[in-house]
Amino acid sequence: MFDILWNVGWSNGPPSWAEMERVLNGKPRHAGVPAFDADGDVPRSRKRGAYQPPGRERVGSSVAYAELHAHSAYSFLDGASTPEELVEEAARLGLCALALTDHDGLYGAVRFAEAAAELDVRTVFGAELSLGATARTERPDPPGPHLLVLARGPEGYRRLSRQLAAAHLAGGEKGKPRYDFDALTEAAGGHWHILTGCRKGHVRQALSQGGPAAAQRALADLVDRFTPSRVSIELTHHGHPLDDERNAALAGLAPRFGVGIVATTGAHFADPSRGRLAMAMAAIRARRSLDSAAGWLAPLGGAHLRSGEEMARLFAWCPEAVTAAAELGERCAFGLQLIAPRLPPFDVPDGHTEDSWLRSLVMAGARERYGPPKSAPRAYSQIEHELKVIAQLRFPGYFLVVHDITRFCRDNDILCQGRGSAANSAVCYALGVTAVDPVANELLFERFLSPARDGPPDIDIDIESDQREKVIQYVYHKYGRDYAAQVANVITYRGRSAVRDMARALGFSPGQQDAWSKQVSHWTGQADDVDGIPEQVIDLATQIRNLPRHLGIHSGGMVICDRPIADVCPVEWARMANRSVLQWDKDDCAAIGLVKFDLLGLGMLSALHYAKDLVAEHKGIEVDLARLDLSEPAVYEMLARADSVGVFQVESRAQMATLPRLKPRVFYDLVVEVALIRPGPIQGGSVHPYIRRRNGVDPVIYEHPSMAPALRKTLGVPLFQEQLMQLAVDCAGFSAAEADQLRRAMGSKRSTERMRRLRGRFYDGMRALHGAPDEVIDRIYEKLEAFANFGFPESHALSFASLVFYSAWFKLHHPAAFCAALLRAQPMGFYSPQSLVADARRHGVAVHGPCVNASLAHATCENAGTEVRLGLGAVRYLGAELAEKLVAERTANGPFTSLPDLTSRVQLSVPQVEALATAGALGCFGMSRREALWAAGAAATGRPDRLPGVGSSSHIPALPGMSELELAAADVWATGVSPDSYPTQFLRADLDAMGVLPAERLGSVSDGDRVLIAGAVTHRQRPATAQGVTFINLEDETGMVNVLCTPGVWARHRKLAHTAPALLIRGQVQNASGAITVVAERMGRLTLAVGARSRDFR
């Protein structure tokens, strides 16, 4: 049963607690030292940083040339270089302009424009339109011509963007634009320039298929539609044997129609090194291997950018084509400096402006939140200040839109709350957008909005995930699909997908593709063990990594405009029904100035809503979250025991390890707990100093007395971004707006010039205000600079801390409802349904399997809200929709009396009936699971619409019952959950004989003792802040164990530790601080008869 691999000697003791602190938390860095090692496994900003030029030497060019036909990786598998790489190569080669002409979209336009602005390359915007009726990925060489359009200035861009959007929406589904050639003709209006294109262009295709006469007719049609002055014949040379002959024939057509000739490279990558990758990507697009697709794929070896000199040599017989390309590029070039649309005017009552209506709503809300003005002068003074800034920046409409969205949620009983820096605003609090009082919590409004900041404010609205679609559709309905769209999320190649697709392109079998991809680590994207993976697969996978694969939907970003969005960016259908999405991601939208709203789905809000409903339904208790006593000691005592499975934000192994050391006693302790276990505070070295001060081990000290007001709440340890701003105010006399400038200058997008100016301002202010010597100011400024990248927003932590308390309160007082609510809100949270159910059982909650006569479609409560019943939707093959139908039939026509009665009233397939039988859901008919399985086929095939006698026999022979182990295995197979057992309990006798300690007994083990533990692996984590340390969470029937694996131990047991569903581990206990961790030394395989799956996170 046990395959124990003892590979580590006892002499290799575990690291000391001090060493663990260093690994887990890093050290504070000195000013000017980079926050991250660029090559390490380190945290990354979610925002795309400003484009940084590579500083490559430029070769220049004596021949003027502009590339007018280039595809980037945003042609999705038809380009092997990013827009930035194309611009960099164009700059190196000295091109006078570069056109980006991706397929059917402007996906890379913003990145292209940003890079070009930095490198002083003139930009031409265009697209290659696929006029065929099939998707580009459906076959190796889809039929239908292409039309290459170049926009002549901003108006041409707007017209092109509109037509791209119209075609995508007319196609009715993602990836199948449907163009109307006549509509394109009319839309051009002299603002486009048409190139005859590559081999798929009208003229080239006609020449290949019908000879010169056909080519002449195709060119005549283009000229008739777009006029001779707006059409040019395109010549390319990719090394094909017929290139010269075709180019000569095409050039011969020009004089007859009075059109120009331009030379292009038809580039699909920046330089020749990407040629092999481009072919591999084309094969993936064709859904074939390189070998099988070779007959269809166009030659791409020469499809890279070239200098003017090289183009002049290639087209020495037609030099005017190179000159004309440069001239046309100059005429078409413009910067992407579009005027960003504003929000649409908000519909306000008669007699009001947006400013006056916002003031009216805010003052009404303030009276509810704060009482009359005389009772809260500070609050009303702050509100007046904020309203003045909002009016000055012309943002009242933004706040009215957000208020309208939250009003819709409240009116439709949908839980929502604003979070992030919006919680710094008293206006947002008065409007009911946020639940945090910024005045009482002394939060700085300027962290959210100030006259010195660029762009609109950023308000994130968390919405219960199961109801978010209603809110999104409300926005579409209110503002119109032409004026509202979701922001895209560009799905890029990561390690596993890169290896799988490149192995496929090279013709390896699906099984081999899968096996090699699984060798790639979840955490680094690198192959942990490259043995057996061919070098060519690794080489191509490395090249394609981080290139775009396809377009997805951002988790919640929506853009609303006062004009059709397609005037700025094309819109297309998403895979999800009734969702239209921009072709740009959130960073693109921000760069252009589009106003974005984040409507984010939060599973815990759904779970809290379900818990409220279940408690009301089964216990008759109406819970008002806003009225819960946030000082209730029992809640904090439970959290201090790290009894937090399922509790929002504090259920991870890192949070569980911190809770017993922090010992939360008041609400603000939860705010700190939420903020502590984050990449910023961890990398900044704030975690353990705070805890030592919190527990009285270290004294609370300040570099200067002026720091005390800002840092008093966190015991002198900086945790929050707002504290950096407050320190600038208190120490150096900065205004709040100046303090926000300092925070931003020191942040992830550091500005050397701004930092130099503000540094001088800080020193001068502190000398003048406090007479502080320079050595003290040096130390304070150094700490600010080191901390700037790490601070967590206090407003964000405050918003989340409320949800921590609410969820912990339900876990403490209504554990059955809490468990059922979490199961109903899946997928969400840190733990699997199996672990949630096991934790509920450890808290005395009885959990029952699904039953066709007792279960709802989802998990619910029974026995006055003290027990949990699993839902029918959790049964394999059923799903929520069929489960709802089954429950509706039972509700309408009474309980099912037998299996034949069930299958006659609800249409079920044989696999579905068998899954119900396996889950024990048919036990209400007096049948054992084996008997129900035997009868499943006959019942499912013996419906009233079948002729009698053609189904299976309904006779059930005498069958033995299932053992407890078999029942547990059946439960897990059918629902993923064993309601009344845990897999390890069936091995307990053998484990006891081996000296394996149950999880619940680890608390009595002395610090430093070695133990043998075993359990199912629930999680594997390698945080970016842990410098290679991997954490494994083991669970047995008594509880959970946090296991720490040093890089050496992980390397020695890599395959076992990475893949085994259950492990036997010998290691050393560390529990001196009250948080129990086992530092692994040896690992062995534990074979479970009942299946278990882990959730592995980065």
UniProtKB/Swiss-Prot annotation:
Similarity comment: Belongs to the DNA polymerase type-C family. DnaE2 subfamily.
Keywords, alphabetical: Cytoplasm, DNA damage, DNA repair, DNA replication, DNA-directed DNA polymerase, Nucleotidyltransferase, Transferase
Single Gene Ontology BP annotation: DNA repair
Pfam families: DNA_pol3_alpha, DNA_pol3_finger, HHH_6, PHP, tRNA_anti-codon
Disulfide bonds: none
GO cellular component term, pick one: cytoplasm
Catalyzed reactions per annotation: DNA(n) + a 2'-deoxyribonucleoside 5'-triphosphate = DNA(n+1) + diphosphate
Name this protein carries in UniProt: Error-prone DNA polymerase
GO molecular-function terms, A-Z: 3'-5' exonuclease activity; DNA-directed DNA polymerase activity; nucleic acid binding
High-level lineage: Bacteria, Bacillati, Actinomycetota, Actinomycetes, Mycobacteriales
Organism for this UniProt entry: Mycobacterium tuberculosis (strain ATCC 25618 / H37Rv)
Primary subcellular site in the record, as a coarse category: cytoplasm
Annotated stretches, region: Disordered: 34-57
Induction: Up-regulated in response to all forms of DNA damage. LexA-regulated.
Keyword DNA damage found: yes
Enzyme class: transferase
Protein localization: Cytoplasm
Task performed by this protein: DNA polymerase involved in damage-induced mutagenesis and translesion synthesis (TLS). It is not the major replicative DNA polymerase. Does not appear to be essential for chromosomal replication. May be involved in generating antibiotic resistance.
InterPro entries recorded: DNA_pol3_alpha_NTPase_dom, DNA_pol3_finger, DnaE2, DnaE2/DnaE/PolC, DNAPol_HHH, NA-bd_OB_tRNA, PHP_dom, Pol/His_phosphatase_N
Keyword Nucleus appears in the UniProt entry: no
Coiled-coil intervals: none
